[in-house]
């Protein structure tokens, strides 16, 4: 890595994972999600700077899973820019009628993860993406309940 190269890290759940490869195959290393699309655009636009794009999204992760692997899969990579999209699986768990307070635990864990990151990597820029649910498949049947619970 040269002095000019910037590390751009994508973190999150399956939406970030996008079926990424777990080896060095350049055709699949970033997956086929928004991380790939953004890396393609920025890689082209800033080709002379040779940015390094890393995708560490893991399908099925909740914020607690992300926090458990944070040192290895985020802090140690020392990203210049860190994009996080997490929370869809947490929302699913809330809809499964898990114990009260799940929303509070999600918020506390996420805030702790972010504050720890800013403490250890104060110059890292953060891009936080809001988790979302689409009205399709499993959510379509109970869409009004999803909307009501997620909007509160």
Q: Where do the PLM segments sit?
A:
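Glycine-rich beta-strand-to-loop/alpha-helix junction loops that act as flexible
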Residues: 11-14, 59, 86-88
